[in-house]
Structure formats: C-alpha cells, structure tokens
C-alpha cells in the first residue's frame, strides 16, 4: 500500500544548527481498557531526539555532570586551601540522545524512560516519520497513521543509572490512528514551536503494560497527538488538553469537540478550541486583541485523595468567552 503523505511538521525538524542545539518531540495520548479487570487508563508515548549530531554513537545525558579534574587537582581541595574555593569538580555536559518515554498518566502514574544513541534513529523513509531499531526488542516506529514498539526498564537499570529517572516496567503497543480534528496554525517562535497534529485522534489496537493487555477502542480512546521542536523547552510548562466533553445543557457527549492549551510562551499560553466543528484559536504569538489568564494551584483533597491540582484558563475577545476549569 502506498505510504500516505506526511505533513511537513510531523517530520524530524532537526536540521542545520538544530542538529547540535535542538530537540524534537512527538507525543501521543490515548485511553485503553484492561481486558482482565475492565479498568480504564490513560497511556502516553513520546519520541524524543535531543542534539543528535553532538554524540551520534553514544547516549549522553545532560542530567548528570561529569568530573573534569585530575587526582593532582583534587589534593588541593582536601586541606581546604584558597585553591579549593575556585575548584570546580564537575562540568556541564550537553546532552545527546534519542529517548522513548512511555507509561500511564493520572493517579496510577508510571513513566518509563529508555535512552539510545542518536544514530539508531531513522527518519529518511517515506513510509514512516521516525523509526528506532533495538537489539532485543521490536523497533519503535511512528508513521502517519500507526505506531508500534516496545520498551523495557529494569530496577537494575535505574540503580546503575539514577539519572534515567522514571519507573521500571515494560510496555509494548501496536496502534492505528486517524485524526478527526486538527489545528492548521502552529505556535512558532525562535526557540520553540508547537503543532497540534491531532487534537482529537482516534486510536485502535492493543497496549501491553507490565504484562497486562489493554484494548484501545476508537470510540472512547479520546486520543491526542502533538509535537514540539526548537532550541529550548517551555519553562515553566503549562499544558491541558481533552476531547471528552459532555454538554451540561443536553447531557450528550460532544464527539466533535476538543481543546488544547500550552505555554508558557513569554508569560502567555496558546488556547485552541473546536466546538462541534467550529475552530476558535487564540495564539500566544499573534497580535489579536484578547485577554488570557491561566493558573494551576495545589488544593487539599480528601484523606484518600491528598493534594489535588486546580487548573483554570480564561480567554475572551470581542466575539468569544472561553473558561476552562479542571479539578
């Protein structure tokens, strides 16, 4: 079957100087139901490429600095001399790696981070967006309308490499997807870009999480697919998205509705909303007159719940008023 045309923004964007000073991230989110217990969980799969040209053959993490002094240098530190005051035991290492991040969101959160040398990443074939071959596990692939792969992180891995962070576990997936609602305009800036490739994405297939099978049905997958790339991540980071709405007026499920909020972009957020076929877009980098406020605060829940997060976003202009309030 002929490969489907891949949107330009979906492709790997790390070209030119971004090869040594840039990142590219694809994120997919879907609900799935356990075939054993019937429990529903929200799963995520992310593909990361960071500074791939800096160290193609070796995975280098920037989370852990490296010792850059000799034994002779170190002896001056022991007596607490003046030299010790200017002694720097570690030096910053620019990261260079490809990573698969996968797991579960919400109360039963689990995040597995699996790192690889950048050279395993392939992005030059027309039939897929990116592919990463592994020695012992199936290749992790992201194409225009499907994704498949597997990752495994052991307790031994985390003890040997605490800089990996995250949790131990296994996850494999084989998913097809179609995007029913997208937003054509993206947030574009010098250091970071954001594209909502599938604000409402319908997934189908299976996920095996820690040896338990979960089924993904397109009718209730409530999927999401977006992408970030550039020179630096947003900090602080703010993100909300959903395609699971019920009308308070009619009580019916709004199948053709979605919202996505992301920032901070110079103390602003982009708010993208589609209500039953009508797109309403407020972009942080556009000069359109609008007022936007957003916040995320910790709140005390019940004894069983513990601390809760209260998210709020409010945006309005001359035509629209949109309030998002999530507990």
Where are these regions (language model features)?
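Structured soluble/peripheral alpha/beta segments that form catalytic or ligand/cofactor-binding pockets
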Residues: 1-327
């Amino acid at each position: 079957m002929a490969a489907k045309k891949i949107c330009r923004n979906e492709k790997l964007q790390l070209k030119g100087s971004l090869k040594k000073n840039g990142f590219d991230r694809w994120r997919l989110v879907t609900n799935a139901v356990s075939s054993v217990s019937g429990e529903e969980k929200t799963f995520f799969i992310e593909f990361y490429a960071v500074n791939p040209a800096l160290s193609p053959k070796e995975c280098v993490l920037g989370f852990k600095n490296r010792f850059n002094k000799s034994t002779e240098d170190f002896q001056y530190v022991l007596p607490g001399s003046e030299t010790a005051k200017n002694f720097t035991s570690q030096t910053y290492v620019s990261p260079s790696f490809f990573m698969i991040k996968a797991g579960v969101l919400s109360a039963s959160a689990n995040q597995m981070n699996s790192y690889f040398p950048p050279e395993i990443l392939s992005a030059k074939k027309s039939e897929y967006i990116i592919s990463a071959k592994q020695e012992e596990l199936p290749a992790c692939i992201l194409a225009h309308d499907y994704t498949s792969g597997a990752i495994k992180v052991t307790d031994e891995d985390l003890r040997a490499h605490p800089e990996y962070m995250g949790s131990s576990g296994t996850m494999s997936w084989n998913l097809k997807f179609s995007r029913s609602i997208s937003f054509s305009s993206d947030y574009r800036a010098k250091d970071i870009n954001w594209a909502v490739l599938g604000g409402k994405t319908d997934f189908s297939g299976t996920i095996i999480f820690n040896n338990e099978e979960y089924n993904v049905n397109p009718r209730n997958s409530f999927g999401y697919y977006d992408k970030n790339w550039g020179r630096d991540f947003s900090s602080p980071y703010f993100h909300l998205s959903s395609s699971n709405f019920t009308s308070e007026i009619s009580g019916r499920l709004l199948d053709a509705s979605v919202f996505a909020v992301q920032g901070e972009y110079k103390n602003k957020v982009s708010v993208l909303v589609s209500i039953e076929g009508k797109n309403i877009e407020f972009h942080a980098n556009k000069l359109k007159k609008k007022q936007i406020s957003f916040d995320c605060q910790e709140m005390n829940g019940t004894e069983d719940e513990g601390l809760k997060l209260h998210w709020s976003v409010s945006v309005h202009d001359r035509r629209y008023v949109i309030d998002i309030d999530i507990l």
